[in-house]
Amino acid sequence: MDNVLPVDSDLFPNTSTNTSESNQFVQPTWQIVLWAAAYTVIVVTSVVGNVVVIWIILAHKRMRTVTNYFLVNLAFAEACMAAFNTVVNFTYAVHNVWYYGLFYCKFHNFFPIAALFASIYSMTAVAFDRYMAIIHPLQPRLSATATKVVIFVIWVLALLLAFPQGYYSTTETMPSRVVCMIEWPEHPNRTYEKAYHICVTVLIYFLPLLVIGYAYTVVGITLWASEIPGDSSDRYHEQVSAKRKVVKMMIVVVCTFAICWLPFHIFFLLPYINPDLYLKKFIQQVYLASMWLAMSSTMYNPIIYCCLNDRFRLGFKHAFRCCPFISAGDYEGLEMKSTRYLQTQSSVYKVSRLETTISTVVGAHEDEPEEGPKATPSSLDLTSNGSSRSNSKTMTESSSFYSNMLA
């Protein structure tokens, strides 16, 4: 993904050929003011919101779950991208003059790809965690240490993927201005550039979204379309409802990301189909709009968490308790009120003529916090009674399908 405009259209400095020295895309002041206000909203909302999300998770033991660690990584990547790239993107797109030097030119083209990779693969890791928790509940879950290793690997791969674009970025001084561009190695038909852009688009957009879509489709079918026969308590329904809320929240997060970034990826694939399109006068406004939509994806997640998750809502209320129109809420519920009430429920499962009584440890709608005790699944010894309930045996299951929940 390029975050600068190619030079050959004087709106996009990505190549070193056909360079125009004049700036044809000068906007009236009122347009610049409107765009500046729109981009300011992104920066403020994203940085503040994502920093609060990080604080809510790291400052409260009950929030330090495997899934939430990935949400911390997602929030960090999005806050950094909003802080370090959004304003620079805007000023360069408006003025088409590079004010920030060679080092930041390289960083400006390098970091967004790394941040996007880290963001989307954090969502992929959450989808995988939900898939394992719901589809394979008796399989071992990631520990806090393993989760941190996964996050580290995600960033290493992200930096490697972004390296070529940062390496080939450079500045060029013209008589009237300085531009930031990417000088790819010379090759017929711009083969290296095309291959890299297509590879990046597949790896940071289409492939992870395909994996996430499959995971949540299977999880959704399991949670919404499957019913376990037999009696079910109110607590059972509460657990299923909690799981559904978590999955629904993450689906909203992923769909928001996909919608926000699709126009931007399409915009940067267009030059390989119709290069003359970038010569049009309106293309600057199209770029500013698609870039605003893409950058705005960094500010929506904190809003989604606050609206769809009770604990995040409590955390946001506490963080902004000084605001006159926000009630503090039950802040103790964020730290002290654990929903991991280990209640033992007896559920009778009737399958044909077999009746088996299972005494199940009902878990919370959250993963285990980092410091909390970890339940280890035991094998199930189901004993059928043949014809008489009096001959049935009772056994305890230390980890059940409905005992792995997310905050």
Curated annotation (Swiss-Prot):
Belongs to the G-protein coupled receptor 1 family. InterPro entries: GPCR_Rhodpsn, GPCR_Rhodpsn_7TM, Neurokn_rcpt, NK1_rcpt. This is Substance-P receptor. SMART domains: 7TM_GPCR_Srsx (SM01381). GO terms for biological process: aggressive behavior; angiotensin-mediated drinking behavior; associative learning; behavioral response to pain; eating behavior; long-term memory; operant conditioning; positive regulation of action potential. Signal peptide: none annotated. GO terms for molecular function: substance P receptor activity. Keywords: Cell membrane, Disulfide bond, G-protein coupled receptor, Glycoprotein, Lipoprotein, Membrane, Palmitate, Receptor, Transducer, Transmembrane, Transmembrane helix. PROSITE patterns: G_PROTEIN_RECEP_F1_1, G_PROTEIN_RECEP_F1_2. This is a receptor for the tachykinin neuropeptide substance P. It is probably associated with G proteins that activate a phosphatidylinositol-calcium second messenger system. The rank order of affinity of this receptor to tachykinins is: substance P > substance K > neuromedin K. It comes from Mus musculus. It is found in: Cell membrane. Residues 376-407 have a biased composition (Polar residues). Residues 1-31, 87-106, 170-194, 271-283 are extracellular. It is a multi-pass membrane protein. The chain crosses the membrane at residues 32-54, 65-86, 107-128, 149-169, 195-219, 249-270, 284-308. Glycans are attached at N14, N18. GO terms for cellular component: cell body; cell periphery; cell surface; dendrite; postsynaptic membrane; sperm head; sperm midpiece. Residues 1-20, 362-407 are annotated as: Disordered.
